[in-house]
C-alpha cells in the first residue's frame, strides 16, 4: 500500500511539473512586441509608414517616414539604424536622405549598379550638412529624433527609396519582413508590416489631395528590460526636516573595481584633468565613456530636495548632475511620478507638461530645459548640472511629510528608469515633528551638508 501511494505521489508531482512547464512555454511563446511597453507611456511607439509613391518598370519608389510617438523617449546620437529582410530578390537602386551601410554583392549587374543588393539591408540617416540634392523633408539629422511631447516638429525622420526586382502593382508587391530598429542601441521590437489604407497628401494650397499607390505600417515598441542595459541614472534625496542626505545606492550603475578599461572612471582631483579627458587622438577616433569616480558610478544623478513648507504650499528643488566627462546631453528630459504632480502651481526655469498614462490618473509629469537657456546639460564639471524648483499646492486630504510621501515614486532621465534608494532609507520626519516645524539644528546643518555633498 505504501509503495502504491508513493508511486501515485511521484506521478502527481511529475504531472504538476509538466503542467507548469507547458504553461511557461505557452506564456513565453505568446510574448509579442505589443507587450514591450513602458508603464508610464503605455501607448508609446515608433511607427514607420512606407508609402509607395509611384511605379517603375521593375519596381517602385517609396517614401519611408518614422514617427516617434513616444512621449519622452527620444533617439540620441549616433541615431537610429533600420533593417529588414526582402520578401523576394529586391534590390535598392537608389536612396535619398539615407543610405545603406553595405552595398552587398552586385556583381551580376552590368551598367547601372544598384545602391544595395543585400537580402537584409541596414539603413542609416544621412548627416547634417548633406547636399540639398540628396535631401528630402525630415532627413539628414544623423538619425536623431526628439520625443513627441518635447518637440513634435523634430520627432520624425524620412527617406526615399527606389526598389527594383520587385512587384509593379498592388497585387504583385510583397512587403518586407523581419524589421529591426536600433535607437541607437537595442531595446526595440518591431511587429510585421501591415497593409493599410493609402496615405493621402494635401497640397500646400489645400486645394488638391493626392494619395499613395500603396501603404504599409510597421510599429516598434521599446522595453528597457529587452535592452538589457545597466542603469544610467540614480536618485538621491534630502529634506529640510532631516539633516540626513540619502545618496544614490552604492554600485547603482556599476562598481569601480568591476569597471573595465573601456569604462574606467576618473577622480575629479586628477592632475591635468583636461588632457586625460581629451587626449591627442587620430581623426575619427571615438573615445570610450569616462565617468567621474563615485560610489554609485552613474553618469547622471537626479537629486530631489524637499526645500520648504508653507501653509497651503510646499516646494521641491530638483538638481540634475552629469558625471560623464565625454558626453553632454542635448534636449534632455526628466519624467517624475508623484501623487501631488496634479497640483503644480509653478515651475521655475524648466518646461513642464502633465502626462496622463492612464485615464483619471494625473501623477506623472515631464520636465525639460528651456531652449537656448538650459536645454543643454554639459559634461562633468562646474557647469555639468541644471536645476529647478517646483511649487505644489497642498491637497489636505493626502498631504503629509510622513513615511517618505514627499519623495518621488519613480524618476526617468531621457527615458531610462533611474535607480531609487530603498524606501526604508528615506529621510524621515523626526519624532514629535509637525508639518510646519523642524529642528533648528537641521535648519543650520542641512545647507552645509548639501554644499559638501554636491562639491564632493
Swiss-Prot record:
<protein>
    <recommendedName>
        <fullName>Protein COBRA</fullName>
    </recommendedName>
</protein>
<dbReference type="Pfam" id="PF25079">
    <property type="entry name" value="COB_C"/>
</dbReference>
<feature type="lipid moiety-binding region" description="GPI-anchor amidated asparagine">
    <location>
        <position position="431"/>
    </location>
</feature>
<feature type="glycosylation site" description="N-linked (GlcNAc...) asparagine">
    <location>
        <position position="242"/>
    </location>
</feature>
<keyword id="KW-0472">Membrane</keyword>
<feature type="glycosylation site" description="N-linked (GlcNAc...) asparagine">
    <location>
        <position position="258"/>
    </location>
</feature>
<comment type="function">
    <text>Involved in determining the orientation of cell expansion, probably by playing an important role in cellulose deposition. May act by recruiting cellulose synthesizing complexes to discrete positions on the cell surface.</text>
</comment>
<feature type="propeptide" description="Removed in mature form">
    <location>
        <begin position="432"/>
        <end position="456"/>
    </location>
</feature>
<dbReference type="GO" id="GO:0009505">
    <property type="term" value="C:plant-type cell wall"/>
</dbReference>
<keyword id="KW-0449">Lipoprotein</keyword>
<dbReference type="GO" id="GO:0009651">
    <property type="term" value="P:response to salt stress"/>
</dbReference>
<keyword id="KW-0732">Signal</keyword>
<feature type="glycosylation site" description="N-linked (GlcNAc...) asparagine">
    <location>
        <position position="45"/>
    </location>
</feature>
<comment type="similarity">
    <text>Belongs to the COBRA family.</text>
</comment>
<dbReference type="Pfam" id="PF04833">
    <property type="entry name" value="COBRA"/>
</dbReference>
<feature type="signal peptide">
    <location>
        <begin position="1"/>
        <end position="36"/>
    </location>
</feature>
<feature type="glycosylation site" description="N-linked (GlcNAc...) asparagine">
    <location>
        <position position="328"/>
    </location>
</feature>
<dbReference type="GO" id="GO:0009930">
    <property type="term" value="C:longitudinal side of cell surface"/>
</dbReference>
<dbReference type="GO" id="GO:0009897">
    <property type="term" value="C:external side of plasma membrane"/>
</dbReference>
<feature type="glycosylation site" description="N-linked (GlcNAc...) asparagine">
    <location>
        <position position="362"/>
    </location>
</feature>
<keyword id="KW-1003">Cell membrane</keyword>
<keyword id="KW-0336">GPI-anchor</keyword>
<feature type="glycosylation site" description="N-linked (GlcNAc...) asparagine">
    <location>
        <position position="343"/>
    </location>
</feature>
<feature type="glycosylation site" description="N-linked (GlcNAc...) asparagine">
    <location>
        <position position="178"/>
    </location>
</feature>
<feature type="glycosylation site" description="N-linked (GlcNAc...) asparagine">
    <location>
        <position position="217"/>
    </location>
</feature>
<dbReference type="GO" id="GO:0009825">
    <property type="term" value="P:multidimensional cell growth"/>
</dbReference>
<dbReference type="GO" id="GO:0010215">
    <property type="term" value="P:cellulose microfibril organization"/>
</dbReference>
<dbReference type="InterPro" id="IPR006918">
    <property type="entry name" value="COBRA_pln"/>
</dbReference>
<keyword id="KW-0325">Glycoprotein</keyword>
<feature type="glycosylation site" description="N-linked (GlcNAc...) asparagine">
    <location>
        <position position="170"/>
    </location>
</feature>
<dbReference type="GO" id="GO:0016328">
    <property type="term" value="C:lateral plasma membrane"/>
</dbReference>
<dbReference type="InterPro" id="IPR056900">
    <property type="entry name" value="COB_C"/>
</dbReference>
Amino acid at each position: 500500500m505504501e509503495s502504491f501511494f508513493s508511486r501515485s505521489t511521484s506521478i502527481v508531482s511529475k504531472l504538476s511539473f509538466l503542467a507548469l512547464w507547458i504553461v511557461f512555454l505557452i506564456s513565453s511563446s505568446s510574448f509579442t512586441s505589443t507587450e514591450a511597453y513602458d508603464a508610464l507611456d503605455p501607448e508609446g511607439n515608433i511607427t514607420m509608414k512606407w508609402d509607395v509613391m509611384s511605379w517603375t518598370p521593375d519596381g517602385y519608389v517609396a517614401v519611408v517616414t518614422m514617427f516617434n510617438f513616444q512621449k519622452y523617449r527620444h533617439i540620441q546620437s549616433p541615431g537610429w539604424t533600420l533593417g529588414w529582410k526582402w520578401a523576394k530578390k529586391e534590390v535598392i537602386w537608389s536612396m535619398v536622405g539615407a543610405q545603406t551601410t553595405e552595398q552587398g554583392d552586385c556583381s551580376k549587374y552590368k551598367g547601372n549598379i544598384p545602391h544595395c543588393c543585400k537580402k537584409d539591408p541596414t539603413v542609416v540617416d544621412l548627416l547634417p550638412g548633406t547636399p540639398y540634392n540628396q535631401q528630402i523633408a525630415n532627413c539628414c539629422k544623423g538619425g536623431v529624433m526628439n520625443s513627441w511631447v518635447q518637440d513634435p516638429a523634430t520627432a520624425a525622420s524620412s527617406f526615399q527609396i527606389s526598389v527594383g526586382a520587385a512587384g509593379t502593382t498592388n497585387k504583385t508587391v510583397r512587403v518586407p519582413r523581419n524589421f529591426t530598429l536600433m535607437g541607437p542601441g537595442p531595446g526595440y521590437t518591431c511587429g510585421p508590416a501591415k497593409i493599410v489604407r493609402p496615405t493621402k497628401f494635401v497640397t500646400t494650397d489645400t486645394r488638391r489631395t493626392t494619395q499613395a499607390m500603396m501603404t504599409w505600417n510597421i510599429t516598434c515598441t521599446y522595453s528597457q528590460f529587452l535592452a538589457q542595459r545597466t542603469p544610467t541614472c540614480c536618485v538621491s534625496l534630502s529634506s529640510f526636516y532631516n539633516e540626513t542626505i540619502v545618496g544614490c545606492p552604492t554600485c547603482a550603475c556599476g562598481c569601480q573595481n568591476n569597471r573595465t578599461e573601456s569604462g574606467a572612471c576618473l577622480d575629479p582631483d586628477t592632475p591635468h584633468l583636461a588632457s586625460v579627458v581629451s587626449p591627442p587622438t587620430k581623426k575619427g577616433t571615438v573615445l570610450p565613456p569616462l565617468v567621474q569616480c563615485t560610489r554609485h558610478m552613474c553618469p547622471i544623478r537626479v537629486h530631489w530636495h524637499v526645500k520648504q513648507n508653507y501653509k497651503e504650499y510646499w516646494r521641491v528643488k530638483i538638481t540634475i548632475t552629469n558625471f560623464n566627462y565625454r558626453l553632454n546631453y542635448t534636449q534632455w528630459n526628466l519624467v517624475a511620478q508623484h501623487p501631488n504632480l496634479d497640483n503644480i502651481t509653478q515651475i521655475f526655469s524648466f518646461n513642464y507638461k502633465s502626462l496622463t498614462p492612464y485615464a483619471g490618473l494625473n501623477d506623472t509629469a515631464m520636465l525639460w530645459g528651456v531652449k537656448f537657456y538650459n536645454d543643454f546639460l554639459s559634461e562633468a564639471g562646474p557647469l555639468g548640472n541644471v536645476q529647478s524648483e517646483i511649487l505644489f499646492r497642498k491637497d489636505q486630504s493626502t498631504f503629509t511629510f510622513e513615511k517618505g510621501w514627499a519623495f518621488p515614486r519613480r524618476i526617468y532621465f531621457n527615458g531610462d528608469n533611474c535607480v531609487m534608494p530603498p524606501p526604508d532609507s528615506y529621510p524621515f520626519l523626526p519624532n514629535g515633528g509637525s508639518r510646519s516645524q523642524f529642528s533648528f539644528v537641521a535648519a543650520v546643518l542641512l545647507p552645509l551638508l548639501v554644499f559638501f555633498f554636491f562639491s564632493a
